[in-house]
């Protein structure tokens, strides 16, 4: 009997070892690690594909499930589609600027770029079902600026391939937005961004709108890397969403074209650009320090549902190789990756058709402001992916 019990115990032990080995092997196979870069590329594609695959066929308005804030102010819901497209393209333009290759990432980029070029044409074609809301409301000034930003960020890949009719339609729509008198807030930079792109496109531009935005941004600097949004400081993340990235982008464009603003010299303007970059570096350091060891960060102020848009300046510093020496590249990459994984691991960020939903971590409609819709979320879901525009061989 003792021999039988001993043999039985040996058999159970062997079976447990075999079962554990098989289970471990299966688990290892399922949970294969992917690189940070692969994760970023997959997330960018996941966010962008539902929008561009539909809009490339003129079917975005038909198939997008529009979601507005519970406190919506009553403006036309059609602003959603322009917000969706403009913010998305500004966010992924740096990544789409990379050359084609035969990697899985390269195939995703190529597909998105092909869809994007067709979508750009639909956006300004009055005969298309997806012609955007250019000529009503004031909101189009905002999202036209993001479209202009996408062209500046990837001119060779996204602007130059467009046919001449489409280019002229954009120039006309951009110029017609001068009907909107922007308030003395970050909105001045939207006007300046559009006029800067018209300068880049060798079209007629309004230098006064650029100069006004530059002058006011300089006046609104309050110290330690922060600008106020107008005369009164607001403790929110609009330095990330708009002010810092657009101010730098506008100054770079003006200086690249050697256009002199009123009562200035090119040397003075270059100092303004350099100072804006230094301030963005300081602000980037603050943003990086906001990220806790658990990959959380403080959420405050309006537009909390813009998610990763908080880190646009930090990602832009990576993309442009402008990180201050105090911020090692690997540290920033790891911090941003961990934040992305924590945010998007929560259920409810996407609806059943794959579009982003209102919320911060998951589906949280109560966080949305009176002007927010799920189109507003798109750019800010992708904006921290600017760094993915770096070649895989770079040290970042």
Model-derived regions: residue spans:
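Glycine-rich phosphate/ribose-binding loops and adjacent secondary-structure elements
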Residues: 284
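Low-complexity, Ser/Thr/Pro/Gly-enriched N-terminal "stalk/linker" regions
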Residues: 26-83, 90, 94, 114-119
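Glycine- and acidic
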Residues: 70-75, 101, 129-133, 231, ...
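Long, charge-dense tracts
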Residues: 104-105
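Aromatic-lined, polymer-binding surfaces characteristic
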Residues: 81, 92-95, 109-280, 289-315, ...
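Extended polysaccharide-engagement surfaces of secreted carbohydrate-active enzymes
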Residues: 306, 316-396
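Bacterial Sec-dependent N-terminal signal peptides
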Residues: 1-29
